[in-house]
């Protein structure tokens, strides 16, 4: 795997923040707040659906961090990694409401950027 130089967080964070604002609007994630118990915890992996090259992991991590800095996010396959279906890319652990609130934005970045990288 060729080493990939990441963009500085200073450049990526405003884009991720704007995506979260667009996704959540003024009211926030009211569906998650209504359906997922506040005390529920989550621990799981984001896995590759198709073979390809991973990109956007830092943007995804920032999305989780902006929603809830207490989330434990581990990048298992850094940008530039070639993955097969079912291979874990990230592991996320923490309050379920926070994970569900950030996941759509995080997945959008990884899906779109990995598609381009592949």
What are these regions (language model features)?
Residues 2-118:
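Acidic/glycine-rich phosphate/pyrophosphate-binding loops and surrounding catalytic core
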